[in-house]
Amino acid sequence: VMNEIEATQMEQIKKVAEVMADCIQSGHLVHTFGCGHANLPIEEMYPRIGGIVGFHPLCELPLTFFTHIVGEMGINQFLWLEREEGYGQAIMQSWNFDKNDLLWIFSHTGVNAVNIDVANEAHKRGMKVIVCGSAGRTGDKKPRHSGGKNLFQIADYVVDTCCPLQDASVTLKNHFDKIGPLSTMASITCVWMIITTVCEILADRGMKLHINPSHNIPGDTTARERLAA
């Protein structure tokens, strides 16, 4: 999967990085959204050692915390919420955006209503939408949304994570379902390929980046000061 990303997505990664660099340099934010395990790339990028100011997580707890299969915050509630039209609109109403901000969404299949609603609301506010997901394998799937288009079809920019449709990758004897999902690894790979490119572009332009430093380096006594700055 990583080899395929490198072989097929570098041009698109550079294009997306330029768009994000322009956004951050102009003093605006790249907002990030995902639900389920697609929230993990968001947690990975910021706040994080080596991450930069400019990326703003939109983390909705009922869509990101579902370690209980049954009971409160269970998988049944999560599956209902991510497929329910209107929830994404309510999420977006809770934030203030600028038309020059960007929205970066992570979704393996791009079919669930909450992601589509969030993207549509971003467009209504004048924002461009970037999507990371398995567009090549799932890009023609019918959405769970009355609008008739999936997330990849309404995005302004798409970076393909090159994962299989089922996500899981390893077949077991006497079992129908596979194990070993790939989408989280692939999405995080795309995250850092994009963000490191963004940082290189901004550094080449002479912009001072606010980088989250490590606080665990022996002898480094200025990490807190650099963080506060």
Write out the residue ranges for each language-model feature.
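Generic N-terminal amphipathic, Lys/Arg-enriched alpha-helix
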Residues: V1-T8
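Surface-exposed alpha-helical segments enriched in charged/polar residues
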Residues: N3, E18-A21, N120
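A short, well-structured juxtamembrane/interface segment
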Residues: T8-Q25, I91
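Flexible, glycine/charged-enriched surface loops at secondary-structure junctions
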Residues: T8-V16, V30, L202-N212
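NAD(P)-dependent dehydrogenase/reductase Rossmann-like domain
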Residues: Q9, E225-A228
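Glycine-rich phosphate-binding loops that contact phosphosugars or nucleotide phosphates
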Residues: Q25, T32-I195, C199
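Glycine-centered flexibility motif
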Residues: H28, G36, G50-G51, G71, ...
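Internal, active-site/partner-interface "lid" segment
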Residues: D167-T171, C199-R226
